[in-house]
């Protein structure tokens, strides 16, 4: 896809949401230690699971086909059991960790924790008006607009609904 660089920002990125590198990057970040902290879900496994069609977005992490994984080369009974346990443990991570894990532009771990403390749950945040978001100390108009845009995107709304169905509901 086309590379873009938002005005005033240093980094370029692929604007295609379905770009394989974008998909892998979102899943790797989601599973990383600072985010949902899913042990055994590193870069190589993400590459393998995306290539094999086991995951296409972060919600798919919670509906893995463990029987299919067990049949794959390099996966024994113990590694599959450990992976399942790590994924199950991630269902109960805090709202701050989830918000950071979702890679919402301008929402780093500190901002994610501020939002979680202010709104308490995902439902309250999803319906929050711009003025409510901006009223949180440490959250300015750029962050508020970025968050509101992300929440208003239908793909992200569907993703949040799928995460809830999968038991991720901090």
What are the residue ranges of the model-derived segments?
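Accessory alpha-helical DNA-binding modules that contact the DNA backbone or grooves
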Residues: 1-170
């Amino acid at each position: 896809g086309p590379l873009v660089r938002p005005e005033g920002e240093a980094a370029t990125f692929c604007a295609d949401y379905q770009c394989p590198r974008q998909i892998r990057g979102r899943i790797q970040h989601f599973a990383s230690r600072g985010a949902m902290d899913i042990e055994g879900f590193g870069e190589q496994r993400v590459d393998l699971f995306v290539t094999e069609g086991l995951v296409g977005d972060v919600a798919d992490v919670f509906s893995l086909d463990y029987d299919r994984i067990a049949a794959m080369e390099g996966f024994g009974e113990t590694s599959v059991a450990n992976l399942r346990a790590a994924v199950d443990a991630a269902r109960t991570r805090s709202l701050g960790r989830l918000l950071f894990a979702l890679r919402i532009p301008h929402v780093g771990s500190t901002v994610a924790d501020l939002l979680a403390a202010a709104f308490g749950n995902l439902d309250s945040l999803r319906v929050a008006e711009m003025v409510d978001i901006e009223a949180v100390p440490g959250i300015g108009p750029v962050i508020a607009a970025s968050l509101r845009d992300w929440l208003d995107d239908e793909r992200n709304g569907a993703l949040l609904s799928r995460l809830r169905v999968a038991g991720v509901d901090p």
